Protein backbone atom coordinates (compact mmCIF):
# COMPACT_ATOMS: atom_id res chain seq x y z
CA UNK A 1 0.00 0.00 0.00
CA UNK A 2 2.82 2.39 0.95
CA UNK A 3 4.61 1.59 -2.32
CA UNK A 4 1.43 2.39 -4.25
CA UNK A 5 1.02 5.73 -2.47
CA UNK A 6 4.67 6.60 -3.04
CA UNK A 7 4.33 5.69 -6.72
CA UNK A 8 1.25 7.88 -7.06
CA UNK A 9 3.02 10.79 -5.37
CA UNK A 10 6.04 10.38 -7.65
CA UNK A 11 3.79 10.25 -10.71
CA UNK A 12 1.99 13.40 -9.56
CA UNK A 13 5.28 15.22 -8.95
CA UNK A 14 6.56 14.20 -12.39
CA UNK A 15 3.34 15.35 -14.04
CA UNK A 16 3.50 18.68 -12.26
CA UNK A 17 7.17 19.07 -13.16
CA UNK A 18 6.39 18.30 -16.80
CA UNK A 19 3.54 20.81 -16.78
CA UNK A 20 5.75 23.48 -15.24
CA UNK A 21 8.51 22.75 -17.74
CA UNK A 22 6.00 23.07 -20.57
CA UNK A 23 4.76 26.36 -19.15
CA UNK A 24 8.32 27.63 -18.95
CA UNK A 25 9.22 26.56 -22.49
CA UNK A 26 5.87 27.46 -24.02
CA UNK A 27 4.73 30.82 -22.60
CA UNK A 28 1.25 31.98 -23.53
CA UNK A 29 1.24 35.31 -25.37
CA UNK A 30 -1.88 37.49 -25.32
CA UNK A 31 -1.36 40.35 -27.80
CA UNK A 32 -3.06 43.68 -27.22
CA UNK A 33 -5.54 44.93 -29.81
CA UNK A 34 -3.68 46.85 -32.50
CA UNK A 35 -0.18 46.29 -31.09
CA UNK A 36 2.44 44.41 -33.12
CA UNK A 37 4.07 41.93 -30.74
CA UNK A 38 7.11 39.73 -31.45
CA UNK A 39 6.59 36.06 -30.57
CA UNK A 40 9.29 33.52 -29.82
CA UNK A 41 9.23 30.15 -31.52
CA UNK A 42 7.60 27.69 -29.11
CA UNK A 43 5.25 30.22 -27.52
CA UNK A 44 1.49 29.72 -27.51
CA UNK A 45 -1.44 31.96 -28.39
CA UNK A 46 -5.15 31.56 -29.00
CA UNK A 47 -5.09 32.20 -32.75
CA UNK A 48 -8.68 31.36 -33.69
CA UNK A 49 -10.64 32.56 -30.68
CA UNK A 50 -11.71 29.12 -29.45
CA UNK A 51 -10.33 29.75 -25.97
CA UNK A 52 -7.42 27.35 -26.42
CA UNK A 53 -3.83 28.46 -26.94
CA UNK A 54 -2.05 26.89 -29.91
CA UNK A 55 1.70 26.40 -29.84
CA UNK A 56 3.54 28.35 -32.55
CA UNK A 57 6.91 27.23 -33.85
CA UNK A 58 8.81 28.62 -36.79
CA UNK A 59 12.00 28.09 -38.72
CA UNK A 60 13.73 30.95 -40.55
CA UNK A 61 16.09 30.17 -43.41
CA UNK A 62 18.07 32.95 -45.11
CA UNK A 63 20.68 32.33 -47.79
CA UNK A 64 22.62 35.37 -49.01
CA UNK A 65 24.17 33.34 -51.82
CA UNK A 66 20.84 32.54 -53.42
CA UNK A 67 21.83 28.89 -53.70
CA UNK A 68 18.89 27.69 -51.61
CA UNK A 69 15.40 28.89 -50.73
CA UNK A 70 14.80 31.80 -48.39
CA UNK A 71 11.70 31.20 -46.30
CA UNK A 72 9.90 31.08 -42.98
CA UNK A 73 8.17 27.81 -42.12
CA UNK A 74 5.34 28.19 -39.62
CA UNK A 75 3.97 25.27 -37.63
CA UNK A 76 0.79 25.42 -35.56
CA UNK A 77 -0.35 22.04 -34.28
CA UNK A 78 -0.09 19.68 -37.24
CA UNK A 79 -0.40 22.52 -39.76
CA UNK A 80 2.58 23.90 -41.67
CA UNK A 81 2.89 26.87 -44.01
CA UNK A 82 6.01 28.05 -45.84
CA UNK A 83 6.34 31.71 -46.84
CA UNK A 84 9.15 32.38 -49.30
CA UNK A 85 10.85 35.73 -49.83
CA UNK A 86 14.09 37.64 -50.35
CA UNK A 87 15.45 38.11 -46.83
CA UNK A 88 13.24 37.15 -43.92
CA UNK A 89 13.09 38.70 -40.47
CA UNK A 90 14.37 36.33 -37.81
CA UNK A 91 11.23 36.95 -35.75
CA UNK A 92 7.54 36.35 -36.34
CA UNK A 93 4.99 38.80 -34.93
CA UNK A 94 1.43 38.72 -33.60
CA UNK A 95 -1.21 41.35 -34.34
CA UNK A 96 -4.78 41.40 -33.09
CA UNK A 97 -7.18 43.35 -35.33
CA UNK A 98 -10.84 43.56 -34.35
CA UNK A 99 -10.48 40.53 -32.05
CA UNK A 100 -8.85 38.40 -34.79
CA UNK A 101 -5.21 37.41 -34.26
CA UNK A 102 -2.71 37.18 -37.11
CA UNK A 103 0.83 35.89 -37.44
CA UNK A 104 2.97 38.42 -39.30
CA UNK A 105 5.88 37.17 -41.40
CA UNK A 106 8.18 39.96 -42.54
CA UNK A 107 10.32 39.92 -45.70
CA UNK A 108 12.84 42.78 -46.02
CA UNK A 109 12.65 42.49 -49.81
CA UNK A 110 15.27 42.83 -52.54
CA UNK A 111 16.00 46.56 -52.17
CA UNK A 112 14.24 48.17 -49.23
CA UNK A 113 10.96 46.78 -50.56
CA UNK A 114 9.42 45.34 -47.37
CA UNK A 115 6.46 42.97 -47.37
CA UNK A 116 4.50 41.69 -44.38
CA UNK A 117 2.37 38.57 -44.80
CA UNK A 118 -0.77 38.16 -42.67
CA UNK A 119 -1.32 34.52 -41.66
CA UNK A 120 -4.33 33.25 -39.74
CA UNK A 121 -5.74 29.99 -38.40
CA UNK A 122 -9.16 29.35 -39.93
CA UNK A 123 -12.18 27.68 -38.33
CA UNK A 124 -10.99 24.30 -39.60
CA UNK A 125 -7.62 24.67 -37.92
CA UNK A 126 -5.71 25.34 -41.14
CA UNK A 127 -3.09 28.06 -41.63
CA UNK A 128 -4.11 30.50 -44.36
CA UNK A 129 -2.43 33.50 -46.00
CA UNK A 130 -4.74 36.55 -46.02
CA UNK A 131 -2.38 38.57 -48.21
CA UNK A 132 0.31 41.12 -47.54
CA UNK A 133 1.11 44.79 -46.99
CA UNK A 134 4.26 46.28 -48.54
CA UNK A 135 5.42 47.77 -45.25
CA UNK A 136 7.47 46.97 -42.16
CA UNK A 137 5.24 45.58 -39.37
CA UNK A 138 7.10 47.66 -36.77
CA UNK A 139 5.92 50.83 -38.54
CA UNK A 140 2.25 49.82 -38.69
CA UNK A 141 -0.45 51.63 -36.73
CA UNK A 142 -3.92 50.17 -36.16
CA UNK A 143 -6.95 52.35 -35.48
CA UNK A 144 -10.48 50.90 -35.37
CA UNK A 145 -9.54 48.02 -37.62
CA UNK A 146 -7.69 50.16 -40.17
CA UNK A 147 -4.02 49.21 -40.58
CA UNK A 148 -1.76 52.05 -41.73
CA UNK A 149 1.77 51.44 -42.95
CA UNK A 150 4.48 53.35 -44.80
CA UNK A 151 4.63 52.00 -48.36
CA UNK A 152 6.68 52.85 -51.39
CA UNK A 153 4.99 55.10 -53.96
CA UNK A 154 4.54 53.71 -57.46
CA UNK A 155 4.70 56.79 -59.70
CA UNK A 156 7.56 58.91 -61.08
CA UNK A 157 10.37 58.43 -58.51
CA UNK A 158 11.25 56.76 -55.19
CA UNK A 159 9.07 58.10 -52.40
CA UNK A 160 7.02 56.76 -49.50
CA UNK A 161 3.58 57.50 -48.11
CA UNK A 162 1.14 56.17 -45.53
CA UNK A 163 -1.39 53.70 -46.92
CA UNK A 164 -4.49 52.22 -45.30
CA UNK A 165 -5.67 48.61 -45.30
CA UNK A 166 -8.36 46.48 -43.74
CA UNK A 167 -8.84 42.73 -43.51
CA UNK A 168 -12.10 41.68 -45.14
CA UNK A 169 -13.91 38.56 -43.91
CA UNK A 170 -15.68 36.63 -46.66
CA UNK A 171 -18.36 34.72 -44.77
CA UNK A 172 -19.76 33.38 -48.06
CA UNK A 173 -16.54 31.40 -48.53
CA UNK A 174 -16.26 29.96 -45.06
CA UNK A 175 -14.83 33.05 -43.42
CA UNK A 176 -11.76 33.45 -45.62
CA UNK A 177 -9.93 36.71 -44.99
CA UNK A 178 -8.25 39.08 -47.41
CA UNK A 179 -6.00 42.12 -46.94
CA UNK A 180 -7.62 45.00 -48.85
CA UNK A 181 -6.15 48.40 -49.73
CA UNK A 182 -8.26 51.48 -48.95
CA UNK A 183 -6.99 54.10 -51.43
CA UNK A 184 -6.75 57.74 -50.43
CA UNK A 185 -7.43 60.41 -53.08
CA UNK A 186 -4.18 62.23 -52.32
CA UNK A 187 -0.77 61.28 -50.89
CA UNK A 188 1.80 63.92 -49.93
CA UNK A 189 5.09 64.01 -51.86
CA UNK A 190 6.87 67.29 -51.10
CA UNK A 191 9.83 67.09 -53.51
CA UNK A 192 11.41 70.27 -54.92
CA UNK A 193 12.51 69.87 -58.57
CA UNK A 194 13.40 72.02 -61.56
CA UNK A 195 11.47 71.92 -64.84
CA UNK A 196 13.44 71.03 -67.96
CA UNK A 197 10.62 71.90 -70.38
CA UNK A 198 7.51 74.07 -70.44
CA UNK A 199 4.71 72.22 -68.65
CA UNK A 200 1.00 73.07 -68.72
CA UNK A 201 -0.73 72.19 -65.44
CA UNK A 202 -4.47 71.62 -65.51
CA UNK A 203 -7.13 72.94 -63.16
CA UNK A 204 -8.83 69.54 -62.94
CA UNK A 205 -7.79 65.94 -63.44
CA UNK A 206 -8.70 65.07 -67.02
CA UNK A 207 -9.69 68.65 -67.82
CA UNK A 208 -8.36 70.90 -70.58
CA UNK A 209 -8.34 74.21 -68.68
CA UNK A 210 -4.74 75.24 -67.95
CA UNK A 211 -4.30 76.60 -64.42
CA UNK A 212 -0.58 77.33 -64.64
CA UNK A 213 2.20 76.97 -67.20
CA UNK A 214 5.57 76.11 -65.74
CA UNK A 215 8.51 77.41 -67.75
CA UNK A 216 11.75 75.51 -68.35
CA UNK A 217 14.15 76.39 -65.52
CA UNK A 218 11.39 77.10 -63.00
CA UNK A 219 11.66 75.56 -59.55
CA UNK A 220 8.45 73.77 -58.58
CA UNK A 221 7.15 71.43 -55.89
CA UNK A 222 5.74 67.97 -56.53
CA UNK A 223 3.08 68.44 -53.88
CA UNK A 224 1.27 65.09 -54.02
CA UNK A 225 -0.37 62.39 -56.08
CA UNK A 226 -3.13 59.82 -56.17
CA UNK A 227 -0.21 57.41 -56.76
CA UNK A 228 -1.92 56.21 -59.92
CA UNK A 229 -2.60 58.73 -62.68
CA UNK A 230 -2.07 62.29 -61.46
CA UNK A 231 0.50 64.49 -59.73
CA UNK A 232 -0.27 67.91 -58.27
CA UNK A 233 2.52 70.43 -58.99
CA UNK A 234 2.81 73.90 -57.45
CA UNK A 235 5.10 76.88 -57.90
CA UNK A 236 8.01 77.19 -55.49
CA UNK A 237 5.90 79.17 -53.02
CA UNK A 238 3.09 76.61 -53.07
CA UNK A 239 0.54 79.30 -53.94
CA UNK A 240 -0.49 78.20 -57.44
CA UNK A 241 -0.55 74.82 -59.09
CA UNK A 242 -2.31 72.25 -61.20
CA UNK A 243 -2.47 68.62 -62.27
CA UNK A 244 0.01 66.72 -64.43
CA UNK A 245 -0.88 63.32 -65.90
CA UNK A 246 1.23 60.20 -65.35
CA UNK A 247 1.87 58.02 -68.39
CA UNK A 248 3.72 54.91 -69.51
CA UNK A 249 3.46 51.29 -68.47
CA UNK A 250 5.42 51.64 -65.23
CA UNK A 251 4.21 55.05 -64.04
CA UNK A 252 7.60 56.76 -64.46
CA UNK A 253 6.60 58.81 -67.51
CA UNK A 254 4.61 62.05 -67.72
CA UNK A 255 2.25 63.39 -70.36
CA UNK A 256 3.25 66.91 -71.43
CA UNK A 257 1.27 68.63 -74.20
CA UNK A 258 -0.15 65.25 -75.21
CA UNK A 259 3.30 63.70 -75.51
CA UNK A 260 4.56 60.91 -73.25
CA UNK A 261 7.98 61.81 -71.86
CA UNK A 262 10.33 60.23 -69.34
CA UNK A 263 9.99 61.91 -65.97
CA UNK A 264 13.74 62.54 -65.97
CA UNK A 265 13.36 64.53 -69.20
CA UNK A 266 10.66 66.67 -67.62
CA UNK A 267 12.14 67.35 -64.18
CA UNK A 268 15.63 67.61 -62.76
CA UNK A 269 16.05 66.45 -59.16
CA UNK A 270 14.01 63.24 -59.14
CA UNK A 271 15.24 60.63 -56.68
CA UNK A 272 15.67 56.96 -57.58
CA UNK A 273 16.80 54.33 -55.07
CA UNK A 274 17.08 50.82 -56.46
Mark where each language-model region is.
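A short macromolecule-binding patch
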Residues: 238-251
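Beta-loop motif signature
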Residues: 184-237, 256-274
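A short beta-strand motif characteristic of beta-propeller blades
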Residues: 29-33, 80-85, 131
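Acidic, glycine-anchored loop motifs typical of Ca2+
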Residues: 45-56, 97-104
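Short aromatic loop motif centered on NTY/YTY
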Residues: 89-121, 125-191
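Bacterial N-terminal signal peptides
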Residues: 9-17
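Sec-dependent signal peptide cleavage junction
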Residues: 16-28
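Positively charged n-region of N-terminal signal peptides that target proteins for export
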Residues: 1-9
Amino acid sequence: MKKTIVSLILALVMALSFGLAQAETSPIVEPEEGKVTPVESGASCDLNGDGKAEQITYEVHNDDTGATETYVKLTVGDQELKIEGWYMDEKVYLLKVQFNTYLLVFDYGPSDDPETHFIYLDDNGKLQDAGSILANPNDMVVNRGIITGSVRGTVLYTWYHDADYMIANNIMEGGTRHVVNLPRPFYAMGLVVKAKVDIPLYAQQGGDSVALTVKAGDTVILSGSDDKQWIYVTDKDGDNGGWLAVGGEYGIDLIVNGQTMSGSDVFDGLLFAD
